[in-house]
Amino acid sequence: MKKLIIYILPLVLLASCAKNLDEYNIDQKNPKTVSAGSLFGNALKQLVDNQTTPSVNINVLRFWMQQWTATTYQDEPRYNITTRNIPLAYWTPFYREVLQDLKESRRLTDEDESLDAAVKNNRIAVTEITAVYTWSVLVNTWGDVPYTEALTDVNQPKYDDAASIYADLFTRLDAAIAQITPGSNFGGSDLLYNDDTAAWLKFAHSLKMKLAITLADVDAATAQAAITTSASQGFTSNADNAAFAYLNTTPNNNPISANLNPVYTSRQDYVAGETLVTLMNTVNDPRRPFYFTAVNGAYLGGRIGVNNDYASYSKPSDRIIQPDFEALLMDYSEVEFILAEAAARWGIAGTPETHYNAAITASITYWGGTGAQALAYLAQPQVAYATAAGTYKQKIGMQKYIALYNRGYDAWVEWRRLDYPALRPAAEAESVIPLRLTYPTSERTLNRSNVESAATAIGGDEVGTKIFWDVF
């Protein structure tokens, strides 16, 4: 692997007011002028961009989760990840832009003797929360990854055990939670919560529960304890969502718009996926007009892995392709689904049905539906927790899959973990639906020994190899 040293990359336009981006006058030839806040804001934007973009060169997880499919070019819906070198394209921004900028921001914060102690602690805390989120994505995508020797002068960093990384992430997150106090952090450079450190504290507790439930099948004790301590301190409404606000103008528009909005592109590469649309049609889901466009009054999804006529199928909705459409790192609906599962598994945090209903209602109202529509939806026997088919994993898994629309990464994690819905591989698939990304080819070239050791440790560097928490 290329030596992971700190590069000061050209910075994106960053924020100067509530969830807005504006120009910073940065002398890109003189890294000493770059502030800790600029680096933090840049790291946040790069993280969200990487998770949000639908570019087939970087992030194809909406295809894999059959939320969308392609009209013409079927390599990615059929799980070809080598033609465009997707593992490298997805891996690189996390290390080179996000984590390195966070590390440098932390260094500058530590060295700034003019900072008030409480502000310094808050800056360190929100930097750590963002880093923990990023590291969890790396582990959930690849398994063992460079961690303890990453971002150092080590030319060929070792790959750390994924479960051990997770354990350390809990330690880091707990430390961040403990040091947050009311007050400022990065001011306008906090592009996620606009300097609302109390909101970051809720996000930290919600993230802790997210990591915990991911471990539920392999370390129930840790998972239960973490959720028990954070259950009452996470998100309690959609107002708490970790939502990143984009702008109407480039380069700060949502990357979805760059790939789908006719103002920015003439390409017509994406249509709704048959799997999700059919499931939503079956239960008359009120979110359909917010998720997709209609075709002659109906919602129609294209087949996965075959060519689809653009005009014949539903497309991502006009709302989703707007340049200022916000991106979610985590939301209240997800927290309620976590609590529903914790209640079903361990009898903690209330009843499964109460949290299940709250999760679905939160999703419907977030997208623009009404409370009355949510009640009607939940009253259907195939949706109601008491009568829906299957175990708690199936009940929650099916509804969480719908709620995680447009969040391909999160839907992919939950599908692997809960095993619902039972997705079928694409037509003419090149492999199983991937359970992980393979290591980038550059890693095999530059860090071969460590990559090979990691591949052996995880059971093979293959897309069908399960991440350590995926045991069923």
Report residues per predicted region:
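Bacterial Sec-dependent N-terminal signal peptides
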Residues: 1-26
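Generic surface-pattern signal
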Residues: 10, 14, 45-52, 70, ...
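Membrane-proximal, proline-rich intrinsically disordered regions
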Residues: 17-67, 71, 77, 96, ...
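Structured, solvent-exposed acidic/aromatic patches
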Residues: 33-37, 71-371, 386-393, 399
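Residue-level detector of short coil/turn "hinge" positions at structural boundaries
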Residues: 58-62, 288, 350, 403, ...
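C-terminal functional modules
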Residues: 364, 368-374, 378-472
